[in-house]
Amino acid sequence: MTTDSDQAQWSVGELLDLFDVRPDGPDRFTAETGGDVGAGQDQRQVVEGTQVVAQAIVAVAKRFPDKSVRSAHAVFSRAVAVGSSVELVLDVVAEGRSTATAIVAALQNGRRCLSVTVLADVPTGDVIRHHLPRPEVAAPANANVSEMPMIGRELRLVDVVDVNSPDEIGPPELYAWLHYDPIPTRDDLAKALVAYFTGHLGISTTMRAHPGIGTSQAHLTVSTAPMTISIAFHEPVCWGGWLLYTHESTQVGAGMSYVRGAVHTEEGELLASFAQEALIRPLRTSDTAIDARSRF
């Protein structure tokens, strides 16, 4: 099990190193889980799913070096465990002069854990342009500092103190300010870093509207897991300060929730839009036989 002191040594630089997958043959890449660095912030021995999504984005960017990654859609089928490396196998569906598509299979110990469909293209000049304005919320200086240990990352929440607490009741929305140091200059790593946080607060956003339930109960009395993540990047993806992640849960029921969101710069530019589907269900009796640190 990782400890708070272990996680306090995790840095943004190390995270970017994890994202930077290495070639391992034609249309194949190897991604490291990072040991304790890769463990989820809840101390379970399960890698954050969006870490592998970020690695898939970098793999596709390396496969199509003359193009820019525009979107990624991931479907999670099983958890990636801390330890063994992950094999990223690219199925190039189409590769043209302006666009390309690849489906990335992420395998660990020979078993497929997730599939990521990635679209890349060559950006062109605008015919028309508009974007969703940044929400008018409290500035980072007036938001609540959140403890999510990582050297070089600051997280501040608007109108929420403890994102995991069942006592944090409010509308099904969350606004999170993020500051990274360093900010990568490589386009693929910048997009990977933006994508990484898109899955962290979706379930908390949904639970916020329901008294008596919070993500502190996840994997203990309630079963939760992200099932899909989609992200679209809006060129150019570059920033120099704080990022605002907006989350809105539009529906929950029948054991699944849906959250949509946006990533803006502090100046108001829209860098990305994202969506998450997540499982929220009673913990089955059979699940209690599995170590809580290893549950999906």
State each model region's role:
Residues 1-296:
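Terminal targeting signals and extreme-terminal segments of soluble enzymes
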